[in-house]
């Protein structure tokens, strides 16, 4: 299991390097049901160009990940708003039930 301090530390590292609008923890660690096999799930909301996978890989490569799995979902604020507007249940769950670990002063999503 991953300690809460390590989770917060990773969120702050993402915030420092990527300057996102928000970093949201979702999945079993956010909902209080992690197991030894649980991975860490973050939604990182930030303006960017290109495909989200490339941005996720760029961020992931800069993080000190030791012995656990990390899933990064990277979306622009516009992409998140689009998914919410069409009723994407997965995105709604992340926004409504996830834990915001970092939020910039200029965040536009979920206000």
Predicted segments, located by residue:
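Conserved H-loop
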Residues: 28
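Catalytic core of pol beta-like nucleotidyltransferases
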Residues: 1-22, 31-36, 47-111
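Short beta-strand->loop micro-motif that forms the acidic, two-metal-ion catalytic signature
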Residues: 41-44
